[in-house]
């Protein structure tokens, strides 16, 4: 399985092409639209999300509600493009029109300046448009297809926010996977403690009035993955490494942890390692899950626990100082439309990116020309692991 995305933030549309999806997977536009709508939701989103109503168009690879095994083409129309026809025109236009919405005051924390240097851009909008988080629309669309595969194999997942702009969410003890999932899904903030909703919303409103932004830490949990996915035989086959790369590729993500993560640096080995158990009904298991479901780059059969830290959004309505790329004089950074926080949306993106990596690993590990073939191979492997 592989995919490409294309499109600019204010261009006509966004596109993804996915190759390697088994034939026979039940797939409807509504499956993808559901995830796209989740990405657009959440408290703290800005005006762009009130303009766009993301709906996918499937133009290849699916017939009569089933995948055919051919490449799948997904497209999402940018409604806002109608206001940017001159700025984002494909053909050549008058010089005066080229200066319209030109970006020459790069924003600290964005790809504007370095992208302009690398690709020799006189207008930094050429970097801004593609590096925008709008691109993640299509990664969510791809992830929605991946989640359909995982669901057919009995794999489920959730995400929730652990830290919201410096406010630590108190996680009620002994919540089951399903309870965590339901609480996060029914929260505008993707948190599992409803008692903290108003406190955080008030804080977001305050940050917005200040023209500032906040980040935080997101946790994704995956249930139902059997032991043995990934490999220790080469560095690039380790599944946790693949997940780390994928999570860090999401806009504004600056760190990844598995299990208790960086807290391991403060603990002894006897406190961190997950003791092994065995029962006739369950087979091998672990007493704890400090390592987040990974050992030696492979899944252990425990829930996968992946955490990602998102920096505050770099576009500030009270802009930081920058430099004019023409005169090299100090100047306030360009202001583009932005949100005080996008943590709930980032959680949806992270969840779908993780789903894509896991689906790809499964498709590369098991016979998967068709879904029935994949389901049989996966079921047989689960049975083997249980009796080992």
Swiss-Prot record:
Entry binding sites for NADP(+): 39, 45
GO molecular function list: chorismate synthase activity; FMN binding
Pathway: Metabolic intermediate biosynthesis; chorismate biosynthesis; chorismate from D-erythrose 4-phosphate and phosphoenolpyruvate: step 7/7
Lineage top rank: taxon: Bacteria
Catalytic activity of the protein: 5-O-(1-carboxyvinyl)-3-phosphoshikimate = chorismate + phosphate
Binding site for FMN: 130-132, 251-252, 296, 311-315, 337
Cofactor note (record): Reduced FMN (FMNH(2)).
Cofactor or coenzyme needed: FMNH2
Matches recorded under PROSITE patterns: CHORISMATE_SYNTHASE_1 (PS00787), CHORISMATE_SYNTHASE_2 (PS00788), CHORISMATE_SYNTHASE_3 (PS00789)
Gene Ontology CC terms: cytosol
Cysteine pairs bridged by disulfides in the record: none
InterPro entries per the UniProt record, alphabetical: Chorismate_synth (IPR000453), Chorismate_synth_AroC_sf (IPR035904), Chorismate_synthase_CS (IPR020541)
Root EC class: lyase
Keywords: Amino-acid biosynthesis, Aromatic amino acid biosynthesis, FAD, Flavoprotein, FMN, Lyase, NADP
EC number: 4.2.3.5
An annotated GO BP: amino acid biosynthetic process
Function field: This reaction introduces a second double bond into the aromatic ring system.
Family named by the database record: Belongs to the chorismate synthase family.
NCBIfam families for this protein: aroC, PRK05382.1
PANTHER family assigned: CHORISMATE SYNTHASE
Assembly, per entry: Homotetramer.
Protein name per Swiss-Prot or TrEMBL: Chorismate synthase
Species per Swiss-Prot/TrEMBL record: Streptococcus pyogenes serotype M4 (strain MGAS10750)
Gene: aroC
């Amino acid at each position: 399985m592989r995919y490409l995305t294309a499109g600019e933030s204010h261009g006509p549309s966004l596109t993804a092409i996915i190759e390697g999806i088994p034939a026979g997977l039940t797939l409807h536009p509504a499956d993808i639209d559901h995830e796209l709508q989740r990405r657009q939701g959440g408290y703290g989103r800005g005006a762009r999300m009130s303009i766009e109503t993301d709906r996918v168009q499937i133009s290849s690879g699916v017939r009569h509600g089933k995948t055919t095994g051919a490449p799948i083409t997904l497209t999402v129309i940018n409604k806002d493009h109608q206001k940017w026809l001159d700025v984002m025109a494909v053909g050549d236009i008058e010089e005066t029109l080229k200066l319209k919405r030109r970006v020459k005051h790069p924003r600290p924390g964005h790809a504007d300046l370095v992208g302009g240097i690398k690709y020799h851009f006189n207008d930094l909008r050429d970097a801004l448009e593609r590096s925008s988080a709008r691109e993640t629309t299509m990664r969510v669309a791809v992830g929605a297809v991946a989640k359909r595969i995982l669901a057919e194999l009995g794999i489920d997942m959730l995400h929730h926010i652990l830290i919201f702009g410096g406010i630590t969410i108190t996680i009620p003890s002994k919540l089951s996977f399903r309870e965590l999932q339901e609480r996060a899904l029914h929260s505008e903030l993707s948190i599992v403690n409803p008692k903290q909703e108003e406190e955080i919303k008030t804080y977001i409103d305050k940050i917005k009035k200040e023209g500032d932004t906040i980040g935080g830490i997101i946790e994704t949990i995956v249930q139902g993955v059997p032991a043995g996915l990934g490999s220790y035989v080469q560095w690039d086959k380790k599944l946790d490494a693949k997940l780390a790369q994928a999570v860090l590729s999401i806009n504004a993500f600056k760190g990844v942890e598995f299990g208790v993560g960086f807290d391991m640096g403060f603990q002894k080995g006897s406190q961190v390692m997950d003791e092994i158990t065995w029962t006739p009904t369950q087979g091998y298991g672990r007493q704890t899950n400090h390592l987040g479901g990974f050992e030696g780059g492979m899944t252990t059969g425990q829930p996968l626990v992946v955490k990602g830290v998102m920096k505050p959004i770099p576009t500030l309505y009270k802009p930081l100082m920058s430099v004019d790329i023409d005169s090299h004089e100090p100047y306030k950074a360009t202001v583009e439309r932005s949100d005080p926080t996008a943590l709930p949306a980032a959680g949806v993106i992270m969840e779908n990116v993780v789903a894509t990596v896991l689906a790809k690993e499964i498709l590369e590990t098991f016979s998967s020309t068709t879904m029935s073939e994949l389901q049989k191979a996966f079921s047989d492997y689960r049975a083997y692991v249980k009796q080992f």
